[in-house]
Regions:
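Re-entrant/interfacial helical elements at transmembrane boundaries that shape
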Residues: 37-41, 80-91, 260-269, 302-309
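Short, Lys/Arg-rich, polar N-terminal cytosolic tail immediately upstream
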Residues: 2-15
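Early transmembrane hairpin of solute transport permeases
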Residues: 23-172
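Conserved small/polar residues in nucleotide/adenosyl-binding loops
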Residues: 306-315, 325-326
Length: 326
């Protein structure tokens, strides 16, 4: 019961309790839930099967949160397929370099294994401590800009131009107006501290799109699609010389995005010791790398940490259970 959880998670030591953990878990789920919809949409543009990625995303996120909850239990973070690195896989690897989804998943798997090996060696600490904090944070900012450009193009705010490369889209496009409305509403809700602002914005404006005929309504409940790419990764192609750059890029983004997120969380959560070292970072890095390997086997892109607010402690287990129910 509650006493057993208290004993395992050391609620008193971390100045929290069961009620706080449940609230944190629900808040975490609401913050992360949009990934369940967005990850399949992005990867589908690169040739992945939408339904297969949807199920793989749910299962990989559930497993990753479980691993973090029971192994890296002192970290107030959740894990899910990373937004940004999935766009690189879809638009850079699959569309740009013309690799198949199976080959891309193989590259994700190899990058995850490299991450896992480094996480088990002293190289991990050397890499984290040798990279300037500005670069760690800059990687996240760069990924955010990359995502913004993709989002603007999908919603129609920008369009291709053979001369200037990018031009302003059709401002009378209903899809653009709905997208802009959703974006502004999410920002307003974020400023007001409303939990789940992203998923609320997605659901509300999706409903508006369905009612106005801009979007197609496909129902509310259905059996979960099969995991199309379960153990369907192409390891041979991923180990070829032509994929070295892809594997390195995937590893680089995942490793330093994780390092930046954990450094930021550690600063707020008081997990940096007097010697400047981050407490239990080895467990956090191992959880991330193992989750990435498992996610690639299930058929989704690189799994990474989601940055949560400092007062949200270890709601990972509740997050996992809610994700399973969904």
């Amino acid at each position: 019961g509650e006493n057993m959880l208290d004993k395992y998670f050391n609620y008193r030591q971390h100045k929290t309790d069961f009620k706080t953990e449940v609230i944190a878990g629900v808040s975490t789920f609401l913050t992360m839930a949009y990934i369940l919809f967005l990850n399949p949409v992005i990867l589908a543009d690169g040739g992945f099967d939408f339904g297969g990625v949807f199920t793989a995303t749910a299962c990989a996120t559930a497993l990753a949160c479980f691993i973090c909850a029971f192994y890296a239990k002192t970290w107030p973070v959740g894990l899910a397929p990373g937004m940004g690195i999935n766009a690189f896989i879809a638009y850079g690897v699959c569309l740009g370099m013309e690799y198949t989804p199976a080959e891309a998943l193989g590259a994700v798997l190899v990058a995850g294994v490299v991450f896992l090996i480094i996480s088990l060696t002293p190289i991990r600490a050397w890499l984290i401590n040798s990279i300037p904090k500005s670069l760690k944070l800059g990687i996240g900012a760069g990924i955010g800009m990359f995502l913004a450009i993709i989002g603007f193009e999908i919603m129609g705010l920008t369009a291709d131009n053979p001369v200037t490369l990018v031009q302003l889209g059709d401002l009378s496009n209903p899809l653009l107006l709905l997208g802009a409305g959703a974006f502004v509403s999410m920002i307003v809700m974020e400023k007001k501290g409303i939990k789940g602002n992203i998923i609320i914005g997605i659901l509300v404006f999706s409903a508006i799109a369905w009612l106005t005929g801009v979007g197609k309504f496909n129902g509310v409940v259905s059996p979960p699609p099969p995991m199309t790419y379960l153990f369907e990764f192409d390891l041979g192609a991923a180990l070829s010389a032509s994929m070295v750059t892809v594997v390195f890029t995937l590893f680089f983004i995942d490793f330093f995005d994780t390092a930046g997120t954990l450094t930021s969380v550690a600063n707020v959560a008081g997990k940096i010791g007097k010697d400047g070292k981050i407490q239990d970072i080895d467990k956090a890095m191992l959880s991330d790398s193992v989750s990435t390997v498992a996610g690639a086997m299930m058929g989704t892109s690189t799994v990474s940490y989601t940055h949560l607010r400092a007062h949200e402690t270890r709601g990972n287990l509740v997050c996992r259970l809610l994700r399973e129910k969904k």
